[in-house]
Curated annotation (Swiss-Prot):
Any Gene Ontology CC annotation: membrane
Upper classification of the organism: Eukaryota, Fungi, Dikarya, Ascomycota, Saccharomycotina
Organism per entry: Saccharomyces cerevisiae (strain ATCC 204508 / S288c) (Baker's yeast)
Function text: May be involved in the modulation of rDNA transcription.
Transmembrane residue ranges: 32-52, 271-291
The name this protein goes by in its record: Regulator of rDNA transcription protein 6
Amino acid sequence: MEKASLNIAQTKEIPLTDRRMGLRGWKACSRPHLLGRILLFMSILFITSAELSSDVSSREVYMPIFNNKLSFKVPPIKRSLLLGAALYEDFEYSSNNSASDGAFCTVFNAGMNDASREVVFEIHVMDVLQEETDSSRFGGTSHERGRQSLGFSVFNNKNGDLLRSKKNLASGTSVIEVNPGNCNEFLICFINLVYDGSWSSIDTEKSVTIKMTYNDKLDPDMLLHLVNQMTPQVVKALNTVSDGLFQIVSDTTLLQMESDRRDINEATYSYLIVGFVSLMVAQLISNIIVTTYLIIKIKSNPSSHIKKKGL
């Protein structure tokens, strides 16, 4: 009986040992899978936090050079930090694609056979904060306070001739026309200058998208742009101005008004000289009259003490 119970106990003990060994083996095998899951979870958290902590400018999509279009950002530069006596607002051509310190330059190849065709640059500018900032905290950004400007210049990349330049390029869409002459390669430069050196200055980056085209290709796009911009308020203002101009022209008073104003402007100096000379003559005559009157008065009425002495 005791042997039988011992055998039963042994037979029951063997499966228990097997189960423990199997559990240990399962734990050992599951450790790599658990470690991989932890690493995957940490990588997902890292990517999510990186996306959430990105600033405003990183949310923009910047296109490569395709179809003569290029998008980029121009960082702000303090004007006071630019050393030297040179006027950094005025670009100077340089063969290494750098117009001046702090400028961003790029080269556009027109790729046209007829060099006399007019080239048109369509530029879209947008102000972008460098970080999540309350721009109204110190009274607005430097651009809103008129202390920041974007400069733009186009050079002939072969000989360095300045073809077109514009200071304080406005935000929004601007269309700039250039007569290239014999040039088919352009050096285009931007510089984002800030004239406010105070600690409360909130500077903005300039998000620039530039597209190069020709007049014949741009005409349909320009027509659509004008149609979209032709609001009822603009139409009313244009009608008011045109009615006033046509009324002046129809009354033939515009030329007469211009002639009268021109005569007044030309006669101003003569009137001034005549008036000054007349004033001096009047003052001299008045002095002579007063002096003569005093002399006559003194001679006609001698002093009383002179009469008493019998003189």
